[in-house]
Each structure stands twice: as structure tokens, then as C-alpha cells.
């Protein structure tokens, strides 16, 4: 059943869900946004968002005006029972050309910010899409 629902007035893009829920009802949607810099002069996304489509509640975490986020992906915790039991991961790129980083946030507590940050040695070019593939699934399919 299709139902149109506005989750936020902020401009957002690259919606993602827990991929285990693809093709069936889901509760949580993860996006990126311009955040508090939601104006035409700021041309890069700097905020990750989590939307609960059942309650209408949203959480966000902003990296500030000198950073650009990539598409956020959901990675389920092994053995997870809840749809949002896992992590959110994204590349974060410095606008001044400094090395990029990968951030990991607890999907159930996104507003608390990253629980881990991987500081890369190089600047990864800004891209659009990301994916996560569990190495065990790769090994099963390609061994």
C-alpha cells in the first residue's frame, strides 16, 4: 500500500533502509541533508538523518559546514532482531582537501554522533553511492 508522508522539510537525498526489509514494510529511513546550512549558498550535504516512519520522529547528526557526507548505509548487527539494530556508515570529506574519514554511528542513537572514526591517509574523491557487503556472503558466493 502506497502512502505519501513528508518526513521533514529539509532537503534530503539518497534514502536508504535496512536492506533486509527491501520489498516489505520498513520503519526506518536514513538520508543525508544540508542540515542547518539548508540554503542555496551551501552546496554540500553535511548531515545524516534517521526517520522513524511510524512515529514521525527524526534524529540527525551534523558534521559542520567544512565537511561533506557521502551516502549513509545501514549495516545490521550480527544476530539483530530489531530493524534498526546496527550501524550507520558514511564517508566524510573535508572541503579543504584534508584526508577523508569513515564514520560509524549507532543507528539507534544517531544524534550522539560517531562511535568510531577511521581516519584515512588520503582524501577519497567525493562520490554518491556506497554499499556494504558482508565478507561471509562474498565467500559463500565466490568460493
Protein language model annotation of sequence segments:
Residues 29, 87-92, 101-105, 114-119, ...:
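Conserved active-site loop/cleft motifs that coordinate metal ions or position small ligands
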Residues 1-2:
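Short, small-residue-biased leader/transition segments that mark boundaries at the very start
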Residues 9-26, 71-84, 126-143:
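Structural signature of eukaryotic scaffold interfaces centered on beta-propeller domains
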Amino acid at each position: 500500500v502506497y502512502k505519501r508522508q513528508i518526513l521533514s522539510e529539509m532537503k534530503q537525498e539518497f534514502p536508504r533502509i535496512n536492506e533486509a526489509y527491501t520489498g516489505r514494510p520498513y520503519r526506518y529511513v536514513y538520508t543525508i541533508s544540508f542540515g542547518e546550512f539548508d540554503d542555496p549558498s551551501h552546496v554540500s550535504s553535511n548531515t545524516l538523518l534517521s526517520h522513524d516512519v511510524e512515529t514521525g520522529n527524526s534524529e540527525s547528526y551534523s558534521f559542520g559546514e567544512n565537511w561533506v557526507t557521502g551516502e549513509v548505509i545501514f549495516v545490521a548487527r550480527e544476530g539483530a532482531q530489531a530493524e534498526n539494530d546496527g550501524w550507520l556508515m558514511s564517508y566524510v570529506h573535508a572541503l579543504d582537501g584534508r584526508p577523508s574519514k569513515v564514520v560509524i554511528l549507532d543507528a539507534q542513537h544517531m544524534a550522539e554522533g560517531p562511535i568510531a572514526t577511521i581516519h584515512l591517509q588520503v582524501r577519497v574523491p567525493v562520490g554518491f553511492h556506497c554499499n556494504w557487503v558482508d565478507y561471509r556472503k562474498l565467500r559463500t558466493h565466490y568460493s
